């Protein structure tokens, strides 16, 4: 929700100023297209989440479209032509998915290089493989590994400072537990000390028994 709100605020400002005239949103899955369209509608931006590659022209009532990365890869030339036709803001949601396949990365670059503005979003600015993420700058660290360079990062500490998230606390518990088994034997164990899975489970049940 945080990334979406930020991106739509940027889109609203750019549309209002005339810097862009259309918005293209690219996301990993079909259902996310509809989520983006619903969120955009709440701020007065009309996005078509049902746009298909065979459709051709976009309806005049829409400010833009929502696409999947796979949809772009299926016809990059079509989406490049659309991007060329109007001053376009392209929002690339979860951009790290753009490196899922070589063809996807190539298609995204082909389709959206002409965009007036590009906004790439991700909460995961890295990949477990070495596939490059489209439109992302990399810089080698001391070990020689390439690290992505964000234009702007907003982390947990920032959100905590701004009061938009609650602090996460991990509580440690300890204590001596005593219980009787079904056979009538009395067992004692202390939470926080090394125990077998079975003993730990029984000790927790005892501790949480109202």
Each PLM stretch: what is its role?
Residues 4-9, 19-42:
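Conserved Walker A/P-loop ATP-binding site and its immediately adjacent core
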Residues 12-16, 38, 110-113:
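Short, well-ordered alpha-helices that flank and scaffold nucleotide-derived cofactor binding pockets
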Residues 20-21, 86-87, 114-117, 164-168:
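Short glycine-/polar-rich loops that comprise or flank the Walker A/P-loop
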Residues 41-77:
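Inter-Walker segment of RecA-like/P-loop motor cores
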Residues 130-210:
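Interdomain helical connector at the RecA1-RecA2 junction of SF1/SF2 helicase-like NTPases
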């Amino acid at each position: 929700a945080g990334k979406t709100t930020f991106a739509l605020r940027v889109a609203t400002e750019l549309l209002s100023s005339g810097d862009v005239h259309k918005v293209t949103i690219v996301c990993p899955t079909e259902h996310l297209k509809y989520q983006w369209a619903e969120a955009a509608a709440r701020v007065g931006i009309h996005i078509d989440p049902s746009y298909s590659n065979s459709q051709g022209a976009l309806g005049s009532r829409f400010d833009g479209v929502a696409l999947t990365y796979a949809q772009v890869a299926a016809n990059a030339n079509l989406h490049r032509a659309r991007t060329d036709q109007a001053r376009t803001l392209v929002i690339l949601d979860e951009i790290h998915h753009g490196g899922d396949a070589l063809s996807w990365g190539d298609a995204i670059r082909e389709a959206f290089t002409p965009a007036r503005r590009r906004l790439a979003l991700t909460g995961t600015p890295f990949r477990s493989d070495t596939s490059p993420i489209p439109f992302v700058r990399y810089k080698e660290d001391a070990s020689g590994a390439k690290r992505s360079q964000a234009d702007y990062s907003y982390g947990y500490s920032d959100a905590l400072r701004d009061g938009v998230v609650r602090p996460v606390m991990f509580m440690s518990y300890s204590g001596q537990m005593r219980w009787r088994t079904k056979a009538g034997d009395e067992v004692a164990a202390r939470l926080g000390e090394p125990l077998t899975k079975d003993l730990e489970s029984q000790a927790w049940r005892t501790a949480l028994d109202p």
